[in-house]
């Protein structure tokens, strides 16, 4: 009887002991340390922070796991947690309330995650936090008040991130730094503020001037883990140590030009120059009245530190190029504008260059283009500027020998588009625009060709996204056909198609590569003008068809 009672007593003791043993997650290790109970989970497939952790844990280590966020209320039952290590996970987001219910937290280590930013105000909930390890993340900015709520912080590691520019105010606003700058701050505290900032891609321009000065003059209570901070940019500073770098103060762009008022003859080349001095280096852009229609080459170069020169080249200037050209320079500090006035005077008729679009016997500048496909054809758009003060009417001529189509449209003032409908496949068309009562002239015409019938809906869909090949533009048109339009002037001396279309010449276009919706290139018959008014396609050859080019 005594032996039975003794056995029963042992069972009760065993059950009581195991009932009191705290729960440990499967695959993890729980242990008792000098500071309390520890949970360590390494290379465990945890998609989120477990919500059933015991409040008896003083340290939690979850490392090399697929954690991707720290959601709000992650540690609601762990008010006594002091050490939280979440190194080498995939955490990219820390929610604002993630650190709530952790008033006793002393260490937060997040090394080797994917954080681009940190909700710094979340540290209001952790007034006792002393160690914050954020190295090897993707943090690219520090707000000036980032450390405002880290009142007890003594160790901050931001090394191996993507910081380029940081204000010295970040550290001047650090409460622990301010406290230890007081005259009565003890020597014991003076050596306790440790910061790691190395291995970041620092851009050593004027915006980093304050931090560079701070690092140069750093003394206790701040200690840098690695004081050899290196500039990665700009190119003139790359490789220099902070201690070797002298940076100027920031300033908004100041613009100058050799000449703000330029007068030239039509047909002459002219280059407008704009010199901008700024720190950091400025970006420069040009605006002018006809920028949507006439694009000029712009060359911007660096002539020295914090100095940029921009040159806008206008070849063979037209009368319509007269006007104000605005050079705009901007940087992070501000922007400035400079206006250059260009006056283009008429050239003598006998010496007018061939490249001018204004005919000697006319008095208008006209730029005619095929701009897009419409439901039933194409859309023409033009810029027309008459050399008179009165409102001018224009005449649009549309013709095709193959389609036996000749159309004359009278265009009133203020209209600059016209839709050409009911186009036939495999046909070349030409459109010309001139002043009312005048015949079309060289430089005012545009030729376009519709492709052969491409078949079903799928074939037509593949032609909606195309590439530009030299001066040729592929356009989808109804019933699966497609067209290219020569954007340059027609070479005919008279407004007749026969001279252009029936002159013998080699194929004048290269195979174009239509793009599908996914951006890949698909094989498609190339459309070429063989000089005899018909369209030759590679698709015909695949079908075994032949064309008589003799």
Curated annotation (Swiss-Prot):
It comes from Homo sapiens (Human). LRR repeats lie at residues 80-103, 104-125, 128-149, 152-173. Residues 253-341 form the Ig-like domain. PANTHER family: LEUCINE-RICH REPEAT, IMMUNOGLOBULIN-LIKE DOMAIN AND TRANSMEMBRANE DOMAIN-CONTAINING PROTEIN 2, SYNAPTIC ADHESION-LIKE MOLECULE SALM. Keywords: Disulfide bond, Glycoprotein, Immunoglobulin domain, Leucine-rich repeat, Membrane, Repeat, Signal, Transmembrane, Transmembrane helix. The lineage of its organism: Eukaryota, Metazoa, Chordata, Craniata, Vertebrata. Residues 361-451 form the Fibronectin type-III domain. Interacts with LRIT1; may form a heterodimer with LRIT1. This is Leucine-rich repeat, immunoglobulin-like domain and transmembrane domain-containing protein 2. The keyword Transmembrane helix applies. One of its GO terms (cellular component) is membrane. It comes from the Eukaryota. It is found in: Membrane. Residues 1-19 form the signal peptide. Glycans are attached at residue 52. Residues 519-550 have a biased composition (Basic and acidic residues). It is a single-pass type I membrane protein. The chain crosses the membrane at residues 466-486. Residues 200-252 form the LRRCT domain. Disulfide bonds join 274-327. Its main location: membrane. Residues 23-54 form the LRRNT domain. Residues 508-550 are annotated as: Disordered.
